[in-house]
């Protein structure tokens, strides 16, 4: 496939692993041009955002310089956002109107927020997606006095803890966590849910195990009001971008690009996808940065194979259990691994070490360390 173009759409966790592979092992074949399309110069590591809110990190920490990483990998960086994909015509249209042609493409642009769709519209509503927009808005606003966090997954729980311990806020914000009907940390072991519930009580965070909604300008769960609230955070998971559903790629019932165990589109063999923009056709797989990180090297290997006119061979088989480290914002964290759990300052130290090691490896490769 020499003289051809590989287009990497999005700068998510999987694609930074592809860039790292290009740096370590060299570009994938003579004459192959790789282009990276991202709306932002930096990838913000979302796992460090709660720590930043709680004053444990600086705002500038947790960033991977995608442009610098691309330059070191021999990849052309184009700033822009994909708004349309034509897999048959092999082109992408960006938000500036530019059309980028490709021979092979990989999608790792993430999902989109669904706060307004699930809760309703309100000027106080702030979705965690896209994460960079979330960080910029939080950084620019005065400390809120009363916050409602909608979403009972690990992301929503961490944000509730972080906002209760918001750096520079005096008095500390009053925080309410509305988990949704699925409850607190669905899919996690009972021991972990119990430890998190205890920590919520200890920190004075109100817990509502019900769906939240905006009704006539008021935040509600059932017949109960969650008002007053200065800020409403939507941590409700990601929806598929419209352009994926409209592209003609095979998608699941919710519009995510269907891929096989090689992370190759089941309908268009020259398209690959990973992260929140994709869904596995062979098995259910929750959208999590953990899976995107581990899928990255698999994606890199398979892109190399396809660019060498070979069949993809590498497969991603998710581990039975994943390690989750939930920052409680007060100098501690709660670890979850299957049925096992632990809590304390040492768990937080482990989280910081893992997070900073991940960032540091890409900073070194990009030459920005």
What are the functions of these language-model segments?
Residues 2-75, 157-188:
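Beta1-alpha1 glycine-rich phosphate/pyrophosphate-binding loop at the start
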Residues 2-7, 72-146, 168, 220-222, ...:
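FAD-binding core/adjacent interface of flavoenzyme oxidoreductases
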Residues 123-144, 226-294, 301:
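FAD-site-proximal beta/loop scaffold in flavoenzymes
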Residues 277-329:
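A conserved FAD-binding loop/helix module that cradles the flavin
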Residues 77-85, 100, 168-261:
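A Rossmann-like FAD-binding core segment of flavoenzymes
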Residues 14, 110-113, 238-240, 331:
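Short glycine-rich anion-binding loops that position phosphate/pyrophosphate groups of nucleotides
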């Amino acid at each position: 496939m020499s003289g051809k173009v590989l287009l990497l759409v999005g700068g998510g966790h999987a694609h930074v692993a592809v860039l790292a592979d290009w740096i370590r092992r060299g570009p994938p074949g003579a004459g192959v041009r790789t282009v990276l399309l991202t709306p932002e110069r930096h990838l913000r590591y979302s796992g460090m955002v709660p720590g930043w809110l709680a004053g444990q990190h600086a705002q500038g920490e947790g960033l991977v310089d995608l442009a610098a990483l691309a330059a070191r990998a021999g990849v052309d960086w184009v700033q822009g956002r994909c708004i349309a994909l034509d897999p048959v015509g092999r082109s992408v249209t960006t938000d500036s109107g530019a059309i980028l042609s490709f021979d092979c493409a990989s999608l790792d642009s993430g999902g989109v927020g669904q706060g307004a769709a699930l809760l309703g519209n309100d000027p106080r509503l702030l979705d965690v997606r896209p994460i960079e927009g979330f960080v910029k808005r939080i950084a620019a606003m005065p400390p809120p006095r009363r916050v409602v966090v909608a979403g009972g997954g690990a992301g929503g729980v961490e944000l509730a803890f972080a906002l209760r311990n918001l750096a520079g806020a005096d008095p500390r914000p009053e925080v309410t966590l509305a988990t949704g009907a699925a409850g607190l940390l669905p899919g996690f072991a009972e021991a972990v849910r119990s430890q998190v519930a205890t920590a919520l009580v200890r920190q004075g965070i109100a817990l509502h195990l019900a769906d939240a909604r905006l009704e006539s300008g008021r935040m509600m769960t059932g017949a109960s009001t969650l008002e007053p609230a200065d800020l409403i955070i939507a941590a409700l998971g990601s929806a598929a971008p419209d352009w994926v559903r409209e592209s003609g790629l095979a998608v699941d019932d919710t519009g995510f690009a269907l891929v096989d165990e090689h992370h190759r589109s089941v309908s268009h063999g020259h398209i690959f996808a990973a992260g929140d923009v994709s869904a596995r056709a062979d098995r259910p797989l929750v959208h999590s940065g953990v899976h995107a990180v581990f899928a990255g090297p698999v994606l890199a290997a398979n892109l190399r194979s396809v660019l060498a006119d070979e069949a993809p061979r590498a497969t991603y088989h998710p581990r039975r259990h994943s390690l989750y480290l939930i920052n409680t914002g007060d100098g501690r964290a709660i670890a979850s691994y299957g049925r096992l759990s632990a809590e304390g300052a040492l768990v937080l130290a482990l989280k910081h070490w893992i997070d900073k090691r991940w960032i540091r490896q890409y900073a070194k490769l990009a030459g920005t360390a």
